[in-house]
UniProtKB/Swiss-Prot annotation:
Function: Required for the organization of the root apical meristem (RAM) and the shoot apical meristem (SAM). Required to maintain genome stability and cell division activity in meristematic cells.
Name recorded for this polypeptide: Protein MAINTENANCE OF MERISTEMS
Residue numbers spanned by region Disordered: 459-478
A single Gene Ontology CC term: nucleus
Gene (UniProt): MAIN
Length: 478
């Protein structure tokens, strides 16, 4: 079996034939986190639950075009980026340094009280019933923010706990576990925060990485147009490692994501092609393989103690997610020589997702228990990676950029119109002023008329139906 056995499903197979999907819609939602006003008592509970450092990261402006270009290089067969200079990935140690989340501890397995209705879970752990705001086992993020963003003065300890749990499920549902529909957040997460001290025993960073791996993997498929997960982690990882549109660093602080919290430049969707070309031209001199060495002096000792787990070949566990962590494919990120890596186990057929999940969780838990026993050592070699690079170039797709032509430009415009038409079809216009609603309806009509040229209207209708069906399948795997 070839290493990249899903090439026909991968977005690169579409790009290389001139089929552009455009820039991904990035669904991490951090822009409203500043509305939450935490008291000292709440901050103490947040710290106890393991999110004391992470809450400091807050909102970082996302570069959707850069994220889209990176996703085009991701291969879910190996959970690595395939760059011209070799494979790279986001490793456990990097999660802890960038986000300030623990990567050692109990696995974060999605839990649910089987005999307890989601509304009763909310009543018991939030003190309120989300009337009209609950869909299945998911509550609206809007209701959480409006009901719990500010803890009243003189609140009892019980009320403080309610408001803190609401904040915690809001922040995980908007960031590390953000799905392709972050407007709704799973009530199941409340169970994880029922006891704040026990919550602090979980490996939240490992769960965040498992979830991000799954989201990038899904988004790397040619049929997808949306991505969730902690995209702040992905973007900051790129800034540390790759000299591509890297902003100036700000004040040195921990978590290290704060180094990139400065003002970002305005960007265009055309930047996707610029970034794609830059990644095509990437050579080792433009890669910072070990970028954190100069900042370790500001890292708390509790995080330094677990940096070794970055080299653990293990299974990562998150809510309803199991993903392999393969540092042996990215040894240059640890200052070691890269040799031809061993084979990776094939992904399971997601059609049997429900049947396989329990088995996956059980075997993954056993693997995670041995995480310190499976530390990858130097694979050997004398510093000469020519044999590895020869092998790598024979199994991958090294370049994606295509020289643009008038025909390609027209296709890109049509792709943008298609994307607008698909987004517009999901919008609710009921709450808008009549003049605003009329203006938007006219714009949508103009776009739809433009698509009637040639076969694009039929393509739009077919694409929307196909993506809805495939997105439903993807949601099962989130």
């Amino acid at each position: 079996m070839p290493v990249l056995y899903e090439q026909d499903k991968h977005v690169s197979s579409a790009i290389l034939t001139g089929q552009e999907r455009g820039v991904l819609r990035c669904q991490e939602r951090t822009s409203l986190l500043h509305h939450w006003k935490l008291t000292k008592e709440q901050i103490a509970l947040v710290e106890k639950a393991g999110f004391g450092w992470f809450r400091l990261v807050g909102s970082i402006s996302l570069n959707n075009s850069l994220i889209s270009a990176l996703v085009e290089r991701w291969r879910r067969e190996t959970n690595t980026f395939h760059f011209p200079c070799g494979e790279m990935t986001i490793t456990l140690d990097e999660v802890s340094l960038i986000l300030g989340l623990a990567v050692d501890g109990k696995p974060v397995v999605g839990v649910k009280e089987k005999d307890e209705d989601p509304s009763q879970v909310c009543l018991r752990l939030l003190g309120k019933l989300p009337k009209g705001e609950l869909s299945g086992n998911r509550v609206t993020a809007k209701w959480l923010k409006e009901s719990f963003a500010e803890c009243p003065k003189g609140a009892t300890m019980k009320e403080i706990e309610y408001h803190t749990r609401a904040y915690l499920i809001y922040i995980v549902g908007s960031t590390i576990f953000a799905t392709t529909d972050p407007s709704k957040i799973s009530v199941d997460y409340l169970i994880l925060f029922e006891d704040f001290e026990k919550a602090g025993e979980y490996a939240w960073g490992a769960a965040a990485l498992a979830f991000l791996y799954r989201q990038i993997g899904n988004a790397s498929q040619r049929s997808q147009s949306i991505i969730g997960g902690c995209l702040t982690l992905l973007q900051c990882w790129s800034y540390f490692h790759l000299n591509i549109d890297r902003p100036k660093r700000t004040t040195r602080q921990f978590p290290l994501a704060l180094l990139w919290k400065g003002r970002q430049q305005s960007r265009s969707k055309n930047d996707l092609f610029k970034y794609r070309k830059a990644l095509d031209d990437l050579d080792p001199s433009n890669v910072s393989w070990c970028p954190f060495e100069g900042d370790l002096d500001i890292v708390p000792q509790s995080f330094k103690d677990n940096l070794l787990l970055g080299r653990s070949r293990t299974k990562l566990i998150g809510p309803k997610v199991v993903e392999w962590h393969f540092p042996d494919r990215c040894m240059k990120q640890f200052g070691l020589c890269q040799v031809i890596p061993g084979e990776v186990p094939p992904r399971k057929n997601e059609k049997n997702h429900d049947e396989d999940l329990l088995e996956d969780m059980n075997t993954a838990d056993e693997e995670w228990m041995r995480r310190r026993e499976n530390i990858v050592e130097n694979g050997g070699g004398n510093g000469d990676e020519s044999e590895y690079m020869q092998w790598f170039n024979s199994i991958t797709v090294p370049k994606l950029h295509r020289d643009t032509s008038l025909e390609a430009d027209i296709m890109n415009v049509q792709a943008a119109i298609l994307q607008f038409d698909e987004v517009a079809s999901t919008l609710s216009l009921e709450d808008l002023h009549p003049e605003e609603r009329e203006a938007i309806e006219e714009a949508v009509m103009s776009m739809s008329n433009a698509l009637r040229v040639g076969d694009w209207y039929e393509a739009s209708t077919t694409n929307k139906r196909k993506r809805r069906e495939e997105q439903q399948q993807t949601d099962w795997s989130e």
